Amino acid sequence: MVRHIILWQLKDAYSEERKQEIRRGMKEGLESLQGKVPGLLSITVKTDRLASSSADAMLDAAFTDEDALKAYRVHPEHVKVADSRVRPFVKTRVCMD
């Protein structure tokens, strides 16, 4: 099993209200990939955070193996969600697999 963990910071230009909307969209879009991507065992996006947090959202996903993770990165459903609900709003991204 391979874990894929990402922390995102959203762009500073957004109000807190807009950031909440963006986080909801990220969570809904990414979690909807469950069952659509071969080898994706679980996927959770955490958006509830304390004021002391330095990240706006976190993804925690598990894959059967490294090949499944590589396939996820280019899977059309993932790319669609990432390009519409994540990448346009992100200032920084930190990943650990």
Regions found by a protein language model. Name each.
Residues M1-D56, T64-V74, D97:
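Short S/T/G/P-rich N-terminal loop/turn motif that feeds into the first structured element of a domain
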Residues E66-R93:
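C-terminal structural segments of small proteins and small subunits
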